[in-house]
């Protein structure tokens, strides 16, 4: 079997790319190692930048999003008895962010792709890649107990951090940058109405975050050791710690409810470059991971594939590789800006092991500056809602 673009991975990056290519009349096949149910049930972040929402509208995929989403116009940051209110529309000429779970985005993209007759092969495990430096790459994969071969003009590696695409790039070609922070996030989902705003807290006991997934479902986090055992955290212990870190000691603001999911997420930053080797292009988590503090993972993946789709459209229409040749540099410029922002927010809001009194006071001074400076809040806001897409 042959296709123009073989997309490995049916996460947000691969699915958005498939729709962008379909719109331009470019053939593609999506190969996904996991089952459809597994992919659709993976709970991930739910903060969508304006550009991501706009793209879903352009592609005609926003009907359910418009019905079920929530719009956030601000975030709050609490520290030392003070509250920093960052109002997005005021600071970014009207922009907002949208709350709609990544798993819901994935469900919408898969349903629309299948309805349009777009081929997605689930439980299709890639076992080998060949000819990446030629003009007809090949993919070997297992499906229903048999090995299959797919040839293509281009491979889009959208298979995540643990996928097969990035390791297929020769070690002498690829450079990786990895930073693991000395803490993790203990996160829960609960059946309880969320507080009014997405709220971050820097407390002497550590970071905390109150967010929402729906009007009836809350998503909360507290900073813990990276190797923390979830079994050490009873529901009561979690709620008590969250109240303390959110300066809600009288328990009058945060509503407790039944916790139905609990887990520890590592906090790390990872970047691999170049994001291209021959006829294979990396996108999304296959090329980069950012700390969750800035809520950027899905949105950064969407930006990658928008740039890639423009390059592929130019290539298949005119034969020009000019945009594709710039793909990696264009994406990495944005990636490093997003890494910088996510690193800044992570450093600003967390307690680090061994923090000296000097470092703690500098951190508090930075928060106090944010409290008093509109320009500082504007910088946070414009990054939070999403930087403009650069011309490639």
Which residues fall in each region the model found?
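Conserved FAD-binding catalytic core of PHBH/FMO-like flavoproteins
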Residues: 111, 118, 124-128, 133-263, ...
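Glycine-rich FAD pyrophosphate-binding loop
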Residues: 22-43
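C-terminal helical "tail/cap" subdomain of flavin- and related membrane-associated enzymes
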Residues: 295, 310-392
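Active-site-adjacent segment of FAD-dependent monooxygenases/related oxidoreductases
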Residues: 41-44, 49-116, 130
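Generic enzyme active-site microenvironment
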Residues: 30-31, 157, 201, 283
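Beta1/beta-strand and adjacent pyrophosphate-binding region of the FAD-binding site
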Residues: 1-13
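Conserved mid-domain beta->alpha element of the FAD-binding
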Residues: 10-23, 109, 157, 263-344
């Amino acid at each position: 079997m042959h296709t123009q673009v073989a997309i490995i991975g049916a996460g947000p990056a691969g699915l958005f790319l498939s729709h962008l290519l379909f719109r331009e009349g470019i053939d593609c096949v999506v190969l996904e190692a996991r089952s459809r149910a597994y992919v659709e049930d993976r709970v991930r972040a739910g903060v969508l930048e304006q550009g991501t929402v706009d793209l879903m509208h352009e592609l005609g995929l926003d009907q359910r999003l418009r019905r079920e989403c929530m719009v956030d116009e601000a975030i709050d940051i609490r520290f030392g008895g003070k509250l920093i209110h960052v109002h997005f529309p005021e600071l970014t000429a009207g922009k907002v962010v949208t709350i709609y779970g990544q798993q819901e985005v994935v469900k919408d993209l898969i349903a629309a792709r299948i309805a349009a007759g777009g081929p997605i092969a689930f439980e299709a495990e890639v076992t080998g890649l060949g000819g990446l430096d030629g003009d007809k790459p090949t993919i070997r994969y297992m499906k229903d107990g048999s090995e299959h071969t797919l040839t293509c003009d281009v491979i889009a590696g959208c298979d995540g951090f643990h996928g097969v695409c990035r390791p297929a790039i020769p070690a002498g070609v690829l450079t990786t940058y990895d930073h693991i922070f000395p803490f993790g996030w203990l996160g829960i989902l609960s059946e309880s109405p969320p507080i009014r705003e997405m709220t971050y807290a820097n407390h002497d006991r550590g970071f905390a975050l109150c967010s929402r997934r729906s009007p009836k479902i809350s998503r909360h986090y507290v900073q813990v050791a990276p190797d923390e055992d979830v079994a050490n955290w009873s529901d009561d212990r979690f709620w008590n710690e969250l109240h303390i870190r959110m300066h809600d000691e009288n328990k009058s603001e945060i509503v407790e409810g039944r916790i139905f999911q609990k887990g520890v997420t590592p906090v790390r930053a990872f970047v691999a470059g170049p994001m291209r080797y021959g006829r294979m292009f990396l996108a999304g988590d296959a090329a980069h991971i950012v700390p969750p503090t800035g809520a950027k993972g899905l949105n950064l993946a969407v930006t990658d594939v928008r740039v890639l789709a423009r390059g592929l459209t130019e290539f298949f229409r005119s034969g020009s590789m000019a945009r594709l040749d710039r793909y990696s540099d264009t994406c990495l410029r944005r990636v490093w800006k997003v890494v910088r922002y996510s690193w800044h927010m992570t450093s600003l809001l967390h307690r680090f092991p061994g923090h000296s009194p000097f470092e703690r006071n500098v951190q508090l001074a930075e928060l106090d500056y944010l409290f008093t400076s509109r320009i500082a809040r504007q910088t946070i806001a414009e990054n939070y809602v999403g930087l403009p897409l650069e011309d490639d």
